């Protein structure tokens, strides 16, 4: 999308990695759903003046919020970094983070045939599909316990 909208340019016709981002790029994306404004004093091939930062960021945010696929809205919300992050490393945070609607998996893929398509990977991370509550009485758990905890919970539910 960034490339189609003119925000991202590559240094060669068949880019392979983010290292192929070319001069004239005002923004670039990285997995998962992170967008960076290509500031002059921040990145080696930066092109955006600090005075234009908010304008570019707001344009990209508004464009993503309008993105549609088969009349369905792709983006649930686009966050500015100061909405999500704070502290001494705020400047290292992505300038925008896009949260997709269910069914859309946002990628910063360099080798893509278009904005929408399929990949070899199936599935995606979602922010609100699972919840696990632990209390002081719970034994220490690891990720390897998840399967048994879920299956035992489902068995108890069907008794």
What is the predicted role of each segment?
Residues 97-147:
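Low-complexity, glycine/alanine/valine/leucine- and proline-rich hydrophobic stretches
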Residues 1-104:
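Secreted, luminal/periplasmic, and some membrane-associated catalytic domains
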């Amino acid at each position: 999308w960034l490339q189609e909208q003119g925000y991202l340019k590559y240094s060669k016709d068949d880019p392979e990695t983010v290292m192929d981002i070319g001069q004239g790029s005002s923004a670039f994306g990285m997995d998962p759903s992170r967008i960076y404004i290509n500031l002059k004093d921040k990145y080696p091939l930066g092109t955006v003046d600090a005075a234009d930062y908010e304008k570019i960021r707001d344009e990209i945010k508004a464009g993503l919020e309008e993105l549609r696929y088969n009349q369905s809205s792709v983006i649930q919300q686009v966050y500015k970094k100061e909405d999500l992050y704070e502290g001494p490393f705020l400047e290292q945070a992505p300038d925008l983070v896009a949260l997709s609607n269910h069914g859309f998996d946002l990628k910063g893929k360099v080798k893509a045939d278009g904005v929408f398509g399929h990949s070899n990977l199936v599935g995606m991370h979602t922010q609100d599909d699972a919840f696990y509550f632990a209390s002081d009485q719970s034994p220490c758990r690891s990720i390897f316990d998840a399967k048994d905890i879920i299956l035992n919970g489902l068995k108890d539910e069907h008794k």
